[in-house]
C-alpha cells in the first residue's frame, strides 16, 4: 500500500512542452521549454556551457524590457510583476541550474535567448498559479520577449556582461596587484642592482625602479580598460531583427537603456545606430584588445620575476620567491615559480581568445554577426581568467617576494657595464677598451683602468658609484 501510494504521488520524469515543431518531452523538474530542449538534444557539442554571467545579463535584459513595456502600457501589471520577479531570480543566480545550453549553437544566440524566455515564463506562470508548459498567462514570446529579438537582446547582454565583469572583477583584481607592486617598489627603493638589456648586463638601477616599471604597466593597463569599457555602454536593444526597430515602440530603446543603467549602476545608453550594433562587434574586439594588452604586460612581468628568482644557487637569484608547494616528483627539495607559470599560461590563453574574437568579429554578414556566442564566451573567459590569475599572482607571489641583497650586490660589482660611468671622462672607445680588457683578463674594471693609465684610483672611485648611476646626470 505504501509503495502504491508513493507511486501515485511521485512527480513524472517529464512533462510535455510545445513549439512550432510540435510537442517534446522536457524534464519535469526544470523550467525550460521546447526550444531549449531541442537545442539541448541537437547541439551535443563539447562541455562549454554558455557563461553564467551572460545568462545573468540576459536576465537584466528581460527585467529592463518588462519594466519598459509596462511603462509603455504594453504589458499589464500582473504579468509584468511576475516576469520581473522571475527575472530577478535569474539575475541573483537562483535559477542557474535551468540554463543547460552549450556555446556551440545558433550564431545569434537565439536558443539561449529562448532558454531565458521559457524559464522566466514558466517561473512567472508558477508564481501566478499557472501550470508549467501552459504558456499562460505569461507567454515566452508574446510577453517575456515583447519588443525584442534575439538579434538585439543577445548582443545587448554581451555588452552588459562584459562591461559589468570588467568593472566588478578585472579592474579591482588588477588594482590589488598594482598596490602590491607599489609596496615592493617602496620596499626595494634603496637596493641598487645591475640592469639588463638584451639579457646582457647594462647600467645600474634600483630594484624599486624596476618594480616601478611593472607597477606602471599594470596602472596603464587599468587605464586602458577603463577607456575601452566605455565602448560597451551603447546597447543594441531596440533594433529588433535587423536594426529597424520593427515591433518595438520608438521610445522603447531609450527607456530600456535607462532601466539597464539603473539596474547595473553603469552608464549604458541606447546605441546611436542599431544597424551597426547588430551587424558588427567592433567594440567587443576593441575591449578585448585592452584585455589582451594587459595580458601582454602581465606576461612580461611574470617572466621577469621568475627569471630574477631563478636558482637558488645556479641562476640569477636576485629575488627570493615564496615557496608554496613541492615542485618535482623526482627531484627532492625542488620548488618552482608556479604562480609565474600559471600567469603566463593564462596570458597565452587570452592571446588565443583574442585571435578567436578578432576572427569572429570580422564575420558580420549583411545585417547580423552570427558568431556572437563564441565572442561572448571568449570575452568572459578572458575576464574571469585574468581576474583570477591577477589575484592569485598577487597573493601567492608578489606580496611575498624578497630581495637577496647579497646576491644583488655581488652581481652588480662583477658587471663590466659600470664602465659606462667612465665614458664622459675617458671617452667611449677607451671605456670600451677597459671593459673588453677586463673581460679578457678576468680582472676588475678598476685594475684595467689604472693599468691603462686612463684614471687614478681616486678618480675611478669618484666616478664609478653605482648608486649615483641610478639617476640622471
Swiss-Prot record:
InterPro entries: Fum_hydII, Fumarase/histidase_N, Fumarase_C_C, Fumarate_lyase_CS, Fumarate_lyase_fam, Fumarate_lyase_N, L-Aspartase-like
A cellular-component GO term for this protein: cytoplasm
Subcellular location: Cytoplasm
Region span, Disordered: 1-28
SUPFAM superfamilies: L-aspartase-like
Catalytic activity: (S)-malate = fumarate + H2O
Highest taxon, organism lineage: Bacteria
UniProt GO MF annotations: fumarate hydratase activity
Keywords: Cytoplasm, Lyase, Tricarboxylic acid cycle
UniProt-annotated binding residues for substrate: 108-110, 139-142, 149-151, 197, 329, 334-336
UniProt-annotated site: Important for catalytic activity, residues: 341
E.C. no: 4.2.1.2
Active site per the UniProt annotation: 198 (proton donor/acceptor), 328
Major subcellular location class: cytoplasm
GO terms for biological process, alphabetical: fumarate metabolic process; malate metabolic process; tricarboxylic acid cycle
Recorded family membership: Belongs to the class-II fumarase/aspartase family. Fumarase subfamily.
Anything else known: There are 2 substrate-binding sites: the catalytic A site, and the non-catalytic B site that may play a role in the transfer of substrate or product between the active site and the solvent. Alternatively, the B site may bind allosteric effectors.
Subunit and interaction comment: Homotetramer.
Primary role: Involved in the TCA cycle. Catalyzes the stereospecific interconversion of fumarate to L-malate.
PANTHER family: ASPARTATEAMMONIA/ARGININOSUCCINATE/ADENYLOSUCCINATE LYASE, FUMARATE HYDRATASE, MITOCHONDRIAL
Name recorded for this polypeptide: Fumarate hydratase class II 2
Amino acid at each position: 500500500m505504501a509503495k502504491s501510494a508513493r507511486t501515485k504521488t511521485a512527480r513524472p520524469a517529464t512533462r510535455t512542452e510545445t513549439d512550432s515543431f510540435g510537442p517534446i518531452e522536457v524534464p519535469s523538474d526544470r523550467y525550460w521549454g521546447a526550444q531549449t530542449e531541442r537545442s539541448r538534444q541537437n547541439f551535443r557539442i563539447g562541455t562549454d556551457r554558455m557563461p553564467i554571467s551572460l545568462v545573468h545579463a540576459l536576465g537584466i535584459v528581460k527585467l529592463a524590457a518588462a519594466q519598459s513595456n509596462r511603462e509603455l502600457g504594453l504589458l499589464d501589471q500582473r504579468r509584468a510583476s511576475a516576469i520581473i520577479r522571475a527575472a530577478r531570480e535569474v539575475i541573483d543566480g537562483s535559477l542557474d541550474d535551468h540554463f543547460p545550453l552549450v556555446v556551440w549553437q545558433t550564431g545569434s544566440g537565439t536558443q539561449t535567448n529562448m532558454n531565458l524566455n521559457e524559464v522566466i515564463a514558466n517561473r512567472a506562470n508558477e508564481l501566478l498559479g499557472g501550470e508549467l508548459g501552459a504558456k499562460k498567462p505569461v507567454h515566452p514570446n508574446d510577453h517575456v520577449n515583447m519588443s525584442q529579438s534575439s538579434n538585439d537582446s543577445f548582443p545587448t547582454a554581451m555588452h552588459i556582461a562584459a562591461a559589468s565583469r570588467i568593472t566588478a572583477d578585472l579592474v579591482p583584481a588588477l588594482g590589488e596587484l598594482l598596490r602590491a607592486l607599489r609596496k615592493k617598489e617602496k620596499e626595494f627603493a634603496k637596493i641598487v642592482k645591475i640592469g639588463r638589456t638584451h639579457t646582457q648586463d647594462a647600467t645600474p638601477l634600483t630594484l624599486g625602479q624596476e618594480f616601478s616599471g611593472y607597477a606602471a604597466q599594470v596602472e596603464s593597463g587599468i587605464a586602458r580598460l577603463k577607456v575601452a569599457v566605455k565602448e560597451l555602454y551603447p546597447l543594441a536593444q531596440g533594433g529588433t531583427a535587423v536594426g529597424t526597430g520593427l515591433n518595438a515602440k520608438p521610445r522603447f530603446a531609450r527607456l530600456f537603456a535607462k532601466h539597464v543603467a539603473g539596474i547595473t549602476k553603469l552608464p549604458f545608453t541606447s546605441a546611436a545606430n542599431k544597424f551597426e550594433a547588430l551587424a558588427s562587434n567592433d567594440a567587443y574586439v576593441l575591449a578585448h584588445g585592452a584585455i589582451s594588452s594587459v595580458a601582454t604586460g602581465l606576461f612580461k612581468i611574470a617572466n621577469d620575476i621568475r627569471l630574477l628568482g631563478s636558482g637558488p644557487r645556479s641562476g640569477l637569484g636576485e629575488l627570493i620567491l615564496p615557496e608554496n608547494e613541492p615542485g618535482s616528483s623526482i627531484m627532492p627539495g625542488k620548488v618552482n615559480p608556479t604562480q609565474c607559470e600559471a600567469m603566463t599560461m593564462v596570458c597565452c590563453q587570452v592571446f588565443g581568445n583574442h585571435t578567436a574574437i578578432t576572427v569572429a568579429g570580422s564575420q558580420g554578414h549583411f545585417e547580423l554577426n552570427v558568431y556572437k556566442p563564441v565572442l561572448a564566451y571568449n570575452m568572459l573567459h578572458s575576464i574571469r581568467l585574468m581576474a583570477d590569475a591577477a589575484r592569485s599572482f598577487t597573493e601567492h607571489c608578489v606580496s611575498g617576494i624578497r630581495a637577496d641583497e647579497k646576491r644583488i650586490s655581488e652581481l652588480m660589482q662583477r658587471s663590466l657595464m659600470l664602465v659606462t660611468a667612465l665614458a664622459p671622462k675617458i671617452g667611449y672607445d677607451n671605456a670600451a677598451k677597459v671593459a673588453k680588457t677586463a673581460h679578457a683578463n678576468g680582472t676588475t674594471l678598476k685594475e684595467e683602468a689604472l693599468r691603462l693609465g686612463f684614471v687614478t684610483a681616486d678618480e675611478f672611485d669618484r666616478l664609478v658609484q653605482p648608486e649615483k648611476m641610478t639617476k640622471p646626470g
